[in-house]
């Protein structure tokens, strides 16, 4: 009977990708199978995120809940950014943990577990071995028609509030051909949509074969779009400071590039953006969007926002709200600033009361919600191209898919539509999802 692994993932799409790779590595090396039932697991892994406040405490809280399973011989591991940040401190506080590993050493997980068994003591490896992990990962196992592909690791921007450069290291790009081979392999398995991942994908600089040539992100997009079977290309996350004209032009020449862009702005005040060390102004950010929408007028935008950064005044906040209203976002993520240990912003004086920050956040979120509702309503009666991903969560007799702009659509249809592209007329619109009717010849409604 195969051993089973339970993986709990926190945070971003990079962590989701890394969790899939942990599963692939363990399956290839030890035959592990995934389980959603923690009580039947032989190995429990927490793939952690350190971006938000109290991330470390959440990890130790989860560890405490599974400590009793050690009596059954269950192994426990902590990976991800909290592991990278805390390292040996995790073992000191939770000595029942067997392995601690960072985002760049997940490929060594089988060796760490073997060393734990051989030496009889916890193992820690949170080093930064450049891009080595991609050389040791087995071919991806995929289910469904969409997949993530990591094209680079780390970030070299060192925004004043962000812990990512310290937990994932500086920017390192995968070789150009390696990315193309992985995408082609996924296409051979039936994948129609790929999401290219990185902390800052538009900083991609991949070596091309044995030459001295370097491929930038726009070049990578061009080549990925030529791979047979791939019908949609997404990417996340990009940085406004490196959104080149070549990348903007790609929206005119690459129809497979979806009509959705997540471009984190963080704030709308130039003074706050400078304190954040973002490297651009609100006007420069909006200029990029104007250029993009000149090419794709209906381009759906999403973003990240931080409210209550140290020193934020009411005037700063009003400038943020102006930017939000000027752009018109279709879904976004917004948070109250939380200081991350070891970052420059953690040492900034902050005299804004929490109640004021909360009120500002609520105002921002209400405005963003209004924008989402208006955009949803504008979709009524339109025909949208949907990638059907599976059955709907609330009703297994219905199907669920996504539009190019990443909006969930519920529809009726036979299970054979799963994994297919279908045209759907939108008949209902709510804030977070749409409902539609299939228009193609495959429209055989399930009985």
Curated annotation (Swiss-Prot):
Q: Which GO terms describe its cellular component?
A: cytosol
The UniProt record lists the MTTase N-terminal domain at 3-118
User: Where this protein primarily resides, as one coarse class?
Assistant: cytoplasm
Report which reactions are catalysed by this protein.
N(6)-dimethylallyladenosine(37) in tRNA + (sulfur carrier)-SH + AH2 + 2 S-adenosyl-L-methionine = 2-methylsulfanyl-N(6)-dimethylallyladenosine(37) in tRNA + (sulfur carrier)-H + 5'-deoxyadenosine + L-methionine + A + S-adenosyl-L-homocysteine + 2 H(+)
Q: What is the superkingdom listed in this entry's lineage?
A: Bacteria
SUPFAM superfamilies documented for this protein:
Radical SAM enzymes
| Annotated disulfide bonds | none
Establish whether keyword Transmembrane helix is in the entry: no
Q: Which GO terms describe its molecular function?
A: 4 iron, 4 sulfur cluster binding; metal ion binding; N6-isopentenyladenosine methylthiotransferase activity
Query: Which residues take part in binding [4Fe-4S] cluster 1?
Result: 12, 49, 81
Cofactors demanded by this protein? [4Fe-4S] cluster
**Quaternary organization:** Monomer.
Q: What does this protein do?
A: Catalyzes the methylthiolation of N6-(dimethylallyl)adenosine (i(6)A), leading to the formation of 2-methylthio-N6-(dimethylallyl)adenosine (ms(2)i(6)A) at position 37 in tRNAs that read codons beginning with uridine.
Put simply, this protein is called tRNA-2-methylthio-N(6)-dimethylallyladenosine synthase
Q: Which organism is it from?
A: Polaromonas naphthalenivorans (strain CJ2)
Recite the lineage of the species: Bacteria, Pseudomonadati, Pseudomonadota, Betaproteobacteria, Burkholderiales
List the gene name: miaB
């Amino acid at each position: 009977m195969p051993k089973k692994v339970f993986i709990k993932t926190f945070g971003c799409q990079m962590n989701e990708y890394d969790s899939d790779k942990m599963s692939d590595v363990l399956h290839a090396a030890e035959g592990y199978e995934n389980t959603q039932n923690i009580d039947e697991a032989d190995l429990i892994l927490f793939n952690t995120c350190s971006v938000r406040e109290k991330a470390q405490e959440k990890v130790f809280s989860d560890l405490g809940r599974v400590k009793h399973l050690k009596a059954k011989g269950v192994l426990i591991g902590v990976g991800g950014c909290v592991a990278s940040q805390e390292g040996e401190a995790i073992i000191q506080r939770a000595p029942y943990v067997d392995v601690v590993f960072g985002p760049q050493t997940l490929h060594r997980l089988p060796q760490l577990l073997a060393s734990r068994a051989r030496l009889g003591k916890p193992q820690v490896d949170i080093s930064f071995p450049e891009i080595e992990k991609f050389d040791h990962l087995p071919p991806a196992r995929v289910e469904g028609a969409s997949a993530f592909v990591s094209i680079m690791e780390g970030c070299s921007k060192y925004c004043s509030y962000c812990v990512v450069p310290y937990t994932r290291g500086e920017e390192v790009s995968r070789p150009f051909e390696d990315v193309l081979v992985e995408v082609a392999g996924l296409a051979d398995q039936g994948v129609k949509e790929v999401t290219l991942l990185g902390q800052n994908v538009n900083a991609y600089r991949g070596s091309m074969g044995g030459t001295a040539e370097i491929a930038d992100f726009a070049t990578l997009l061009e080549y990925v779009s030529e791979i047979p079977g791939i019908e949609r290309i997404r990417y996340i996350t990009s940085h406004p400071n490196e959104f080149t004209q070549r990348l903007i032009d790609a929206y005119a020449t690459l129809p497979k590039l979806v009509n959705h862009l997540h471009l984190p702005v963080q704030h709308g005040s130039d003074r706050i953006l400078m304190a954040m060390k973002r490297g651009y102004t609100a006007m420069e950010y909006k200029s990029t969007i104007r250029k993009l929408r000149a090419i794709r007028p209906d381009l759906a935008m999403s973003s990240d926002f931080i409210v209550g950064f140290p020193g934020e005044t009411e005037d700063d906040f009003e400038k943020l709200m102006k930017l939000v209203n000027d752009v018109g976002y279709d879904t976004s993520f917004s948070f109250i600033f939380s200081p991350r240990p070891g970052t420059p912003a953690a040492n900034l004086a902050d005299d804004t009361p929490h109640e004021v920050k909360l009120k500002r956040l609520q105002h921002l979120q209400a405005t963003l919600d209004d924008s989402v509702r208006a955009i949803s309503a504008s979709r009524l009666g339109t025909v949208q191209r949907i990638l059907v991903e599976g059955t709907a969560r609330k009703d297994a007799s219905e199907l669920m898919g996504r539009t190019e702009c990443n909006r969930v659509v519920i529809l009726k249809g036979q299970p054979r539509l799963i994994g297919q592209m279908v045209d759907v007329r939108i008949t209902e619109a709510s804030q977070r999802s749409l409902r539609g009717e299939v228009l193609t010849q495959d429209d055989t409604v399930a009985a």
